[in-house]
Amino acid sequence: MKLAFVNPYHVKQSKEMDDNSPRKTDEKDPKTIAKLVTEGRYSFPYLPEGIYAELREAVSVRDQIVKAMNAAANRIQRWLTIYFPEYLKVYKVFDSVSGLTMLWQAPLPEDVVKLGADGIVALWHEKKLRAVGKKRAQTLIEAAKSSIGMPGGNCAKMNLHLLLEDYFTKKEQLERITAVLQEELLKVPNSEKLLAVKGIGIITVAGFLAEVGDLRRFTSPKQIQKLAGLEPKENSSGKHKGRTSISKRGRRKLRRLLFQAVLPLIRSNEDFREVYTYYSTRKDNPLKGTQAVIAVGCKLIRIFYVLLSHGADYSSTRFRADILRPGQAKAALRTTRLYSGKRPSVKMLN
């Protein structure tokens, strides 16, 4: 027997069609659901199989590890705020190798002072840390001498050791699951095409495939855009033109992943930055900050779809082609004719 899925929102919106009553009971719901099924308003849930199921499981495990690792890091920084707040002024990030070595051997300010500059340097040399020296050790000692942290004892030290052990464990687990994720990702056909795009990493591609699954079930990138909840939601009637927003339906993790991937792309990739600038500064219908980011995210979906489906290589020229407008197209035609001696087609430029 094959199971079908009826959207609960459809049931809620359809419950008044027969009796014109907002009443909702266990007797009424089955009738409403059966009516929707007879009208063909149902769908079959998609369950990824094979490599896509493995990727979804691996990405889910990685998200759990990252969440636990961040929680452990926050607890460590809380401990430092209570007992040694000056540590966070000496080290901008608490998890530097030399800093973690000090926290394990001399967690409290009095331990740092007791160890002395020579002892700290010897400890770092024992761990083969060459990027730090006596100057950093002296800075740490001065911070410890003027510390305003609460006095701590053996229990405070033990608490920090347990927190550090938890953090180290999660960090090691993160490295293991990332290695497995990379190994599984390379089994997907044409996945290396996506990794060739500047600013696109393993986590982004793996997360995209984990949420979308097999791309062969889609006939258009707009279907993936709808799955991510980035479909434009128009609100207009007659002469009234309401505000257009995104639907925010579908897989929210996919929508979050695309948003998090586009922001660094705009900063590090010249092609994406140029398209973002065009969307936000064009004369006709310029987009605001978030709107332009969403537009670039939808374009990223189309790129992923083409590269994975057709095995094509990423082309910077084709990526920027849609920002050419009639005036720019004429100039591009003249430039192309000047350097190539051939008459290019307008279709090639648009």
Descriptions of predicted regions:
Residues 1-350:
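A detector of single, family-specific signature residues
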